[in-house]
Amino acid sequence: MRCRFFLVLCLSSLFVSALGDEKATSARFESIKSQPLKLRHFLSTMPKGGDLHSHLSGAIYAESYLAWAAQDDKCIDLSSLVLTSGPCESGEELKPVKEFFPGGPQDVDDLLVRVVDALSVRDYNLRGLSGHQQFFSTFSRFYQASAGRLGDMLAEVTDRAARQNIGYLELMHSPGMIAASIEAERKSDLTLPFGQRVSHPAIRQIAKRAMAEIDEMEKRRSSLQACNLKNGGASGCSVAVRYLAQVIRTWRPEQVYAQTLLAFMLMELDDRVVGLNFVAPEDHPVSLRDYSRHMNFIKELSQKFEGSNRNIALHAGELSLGLVPPEHLGWHIRDAVEIAGAKRIGHGIDISYDPQMYATLGKMRQREVAVEIN
């Protein structure tokens, strides 16, 4: 009896202590929320749980891509400011990245400023571009710099997450998606029955190679962060990472189907791949034309892969008036939830255009569908 009383007393003390901490934290926040410097420090030190909406390639700073490109003898196309693989042929519009990064004479520094701006969203508003245009234009420019650097990228984002007191990252990544698309180009027919539209054995082999790619990038991350040291390595080692298989929605229907099939196979085969997402501009003509078809791809494959976790997170409703004709507004979120069975919606800014907005929101609440606002 005395032991039980002591346990109750301890638990009560912990509850009172936690309640006191919560009140003190709330009071501190209220006192500094109009003071940007103190507020930033308060929020940076606050534990934040997980970041559920993060594109691995989009989370890397331009300067990191340039450093790797310089080390790997990559080039910059001076007309398009696109990073390319070497060699940099003399007399062409290709310049070795190592000649201007990390900097030097004034003319070199001027080029560096232009390149960093082109590879990021820095100062985009000064160039007469929308953030939307600039953001989506950067991926093709820095793509070549990411080749062979996936582990370095993983180390960078986990180190940064640790500094921000984020303990979990769910990274959108596309292992094997290009290979699946090439396989669909080689042989596919969406009019055939399930199992015959693309080669399932070929896609399964791609999935196994994709798993090996994840193994390699995680091994490289661990090495860079010295995570195997007895006394612990970099703080980024403590950040748990899982992946969303990232399907590129702007390609031909057969290719998107093959990618979606690959995503479900990865979810089935590898516990590190906890779901899928569709990426690339939702306002792209192909994305708009095939949107309903894509949702039905997910629906069908969810039913066929009942043993997998089937966690669907979708960019949906990332649209606004002026970006697309009004006929494309107000139904993408609804279809993502009702047809594809999405458990999370990315952005979802066009919800107010849905004529059935309250019914859609009610269904999302009932199904506990989260909205990723970032």
What name fits each language-model region?
Residues 19-373:
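Metal-cofactor-binding active-site regions of metalloenzymes
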Residues 1-6:
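Bacterial N-terminal signal peptides that target proteins for export
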Residues 7-14:
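Bacterial N-terminal signal peptides
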